[in-house]
Amino acid sequence: MPHSTAAPATAWTHPPVRVGLVGAGPWARAMHARMLAAGPETTLAGVWARRPEAAAEVAAAYGAPAAASFEELLDTCEAVAFAVPPAVQAALAPRAAAAGRALLLEKPLGTDLETARAVADAVAEHQVISQLVLTKRYHPATRAFLAEAATREVTGARSCYLHGAFLEGDFATAWRLEHGALLDLGPHLLDLLDTAVAPIVSVRATGDPTRWIELTCEHENGAVSQASLSGSVNLPRARTRVELFGPGEELVYDTADIDHEECWPILRREFATAVRTGQGTGIDAAHGLHIQRLLASARP
């Protein structure tokens, strides 16, 4: 898989952040390990996974050690990146926070509101930096869309996130097949609607998360939005689209022409900057808990 290692235009002047990686599955291999090893803002300090042979394989590809235990991984790093199912992340992230490690977290924080709250509470209690891998948020096209949306009066919105990854392949994993598109794709779309329209105050759902689920959201500003989610439909490529409507011209965000490889250098730089300066981005565990509350209220 091609992977952009292009660094942002300004030089990195801090020591690289030593990041330990938890997980050695498809997403750990395809994104986390490559991104963290590319630097210059980060180095891959070690890899730990439930299967030692898988951790060793991922670590060896980047000249990093494979840790024999989670505790050993914590000893080698100053930040931890998670590329594991939500239930595993929710069990381990509070331990990393208690050890004073910064957290690069996947969405959703946990499989339910209780476990997600435990992660967010640990981050707050131990005052560690946290950042959520809401991939699309780190793409320049997304940021341009959100900046323009902030200038608009929005009456209503329609959106979708659709693909067929649950049908077969590496990403048809047990937790995705069990919980479906609501927990896997829902955080991305709810985050975009919550940011582009106005904070979401209520969500109603209909359908089956493992097949197709429809969400109707009410926002603080009185706007109403709808979101269609499915990971079980046959499409030539993933489709993410948000349409904003109001008194002015419609505003459309569509990922059809964006290269997600552009996200990784930005994500890496912003996480490392947050760790080195102690100033988070706002796309953090607290925001993840807000999204998890919306997911919980949308459970059909």
Regions found by a protein language model. Give the residues of each.
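C-terminal helix-rich "cap/oligomerization" subdomain common to oxidoreductases
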Residues: 1-13, 72, 79-82, 128, ...
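N-terminal Rossmann-like dinucleotide-binding module
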Residues: 1-62
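Contiguous beta-strand/loop segments that form the cofactor/metal-binding neighborhood of enzyme cores
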Residues: 2, 190-255, 269-277
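Hydrophobic residues in well-ordered beta-strands that form the structural core
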Residues: 28, 68, 105-106, 130-132
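Beta-loop-alpha module in the N-terminal Rossmann-like domain of NAD(P)-dependent dehydrogenases
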Residues: 62-120
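A short helix->loop->beta-strand "cap" motif at the edges of active sites that frequently abuts
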Residues: 64, 99-101, 126-129, 222-223
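A contiguous active-site-proximal alpha/beta segment in oxidoreductase catalytic domains
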Residues: 110-168
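Mid-domain beta-loop-alpha active-site segment that forms a flexible
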Residues: 133-140, 168-200, 267, 287
